[in-house]
Amino acid sequence: TDLTGNYLFKHTIERLRPCSDPDFSVHVRLLVNHCSGGYSFISNHAANHFGMALFFYISFRNVLGRWVWTAILWAAAIAYAQVYVGVHYPIDVLAGAVWGSLIGITTGRLFNKHIGFAIFDK
């Protein structure tokens, strides 16, 4: 998710972060020590965490049971925090969550098809 987020989206779209945008930064309440460099769209934090969460959901829900939802709640909290601290617009984290979810679902299905729970058989 991280590489595709950077090279397919960030370096193609080149959207400034809310805290870096000269027209918008006066409206941002930045809650971190500095505004990160780089571009904003998509949020790789959201993509990475939703990718992992959906991979775990697809691959391990039978093993982890209801605990698998903890990963999805964690991903949602990370995504919300990116907007809350002022380094992403809401659409950045929404797009990151969707992109990460698609990758997580795809890799989870591939994992189940080719490896599955054979790793637990001993």
Report each predicted region and the residues it spans.
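Transmembrane alpha-helix/helix-exit interface in multi-pass inner-membrane proteins
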Residues: 2-20
